[in-house]
Amino acid sequence: MTDNRKTTVPGASVGADAVQSSSKINTNIITNSDKQINLQAAKKSNNFGLNTVSMTELYDTVYPPRRPIVNDLLYSGTYLFVGAPKVGKSFFMGQLAYHVAMGLPLWEYEVHQGTVLYLALEDDYARLQRRLSRMFGVEETSNLYFATQAKSVSEGLDQQLEGFIREHPDVRLIIIDTLQKVREIGGDRYSYASDYEIVTRLKTFSDRYGICLLVVHHTRKMEAEDSFDMISGTNGLLGAADGAFIMQKKRRTDNTALLDIVGRDQPDQELTLEFDRERCVWEFQGAETELWKLPPDPLLEAVAKMLTPEQPEWSGTPTELLERLSGVSIQANILTRKLNVSADRLYNDYGIRYESRRTHEGREVKLTLENSGA
């Protein structure tokens, strides 16, 4: 019989079903409100106040899944989108923004719908109107917003973006076009330290709110064997970012462009795109290599079979969960630890949110099917 008891306050340590004293309730799941804390289990050392976390605490903590904006292409975090002037970056930004706001697939990639803010800082509203109407006709979406002016990072850009997020809590993507428009002006603006600092500040913001910041930037004029060495400025920009896209053409007049993609938590890709000059959109022509996928995990497959759109939730103890999982033979505390470290994949591949809590009665886990189409 399915146990659908209501879960209580979230909790911290891992183990089997042992009962805990009623005087103490711990939590081991990071919620949306404290995404800015990278390691919830971190504790201050008595020596110099260094925040540390043990490997045990690391494994015993459930971290929020890194949500995709566009599957296998763009995730929450801070990314650079780099290309030569007039290569077609702004058309791509408009196309991406529209698809995310509408929830429409981008070529063969699934898109997760949400509000989009596009800071088109090198444009005016009249030009935006002409460009978008040429790309998409007059079919509009109410959750795609534009601004043509914004403060710099040092003068309060983060407060402006925070205000927008408060008004639109379902924001998934913010595009800054271009980086030069929001960076400080100074003699050392191209030093490694200043480049690293500005992207780090943007990344801190995107991590705090669990959104994607996509920052448009230019390539340098000199050629390089590695396309990512063509990013204008120093390696500090790429070093601090979660990933980068490099768009380049062999000749400026070509319709075809290569889009090289790298990221911390995603496979490298090289896409071939062709620009449709009539509609001013980029069309997918092919990828250099097939995306490598992790092989199926028997444990996650078994968990996924438990939940259906008709019965999208289950909660109970780890021991009760083991009884429901056919073909899984491990100890209860090992089960929770394996699910802890697989929470991101369980959510992104199967659409299942996993929570692990310690209550007065003992360990309790909760599984919720949030997206049956994952």
Regions found by a protein language model. Give the residues of each.
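Phosphate-binding/switch region of NTP-binding enzymes
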Residues: 80-82, 86, 90-91, 119, ...
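Pre-Walker A (Motif I) flank of P-loop NTPase domains
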Residues: 75-79, 114
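Core recognition of P-loop NTPase motor domains used across DNA-transaction enzymes
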Residues: 2-75, 87, 130, 138-141, ...
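Post-Walker A helix-loop "phosphate-sensing" segment adjacent to the P-loop in P-loop NTPases
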Residues: 99-113, 347
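Conserved inter-motif catalytic segment of the P-loop NTP-binding fold
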Residues: 46, 56, 64-65, 69-70, ...
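Hydrophobic positions on the alpha1 helix immediately C-terminal to the Walker A/P-loop
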Residues: 92, 96
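DNA transaction DNA-binding modules
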Residues: 272-374
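Helix C-cap/helix->beta junction micro-motif
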Residues: 168, 205-209, 350
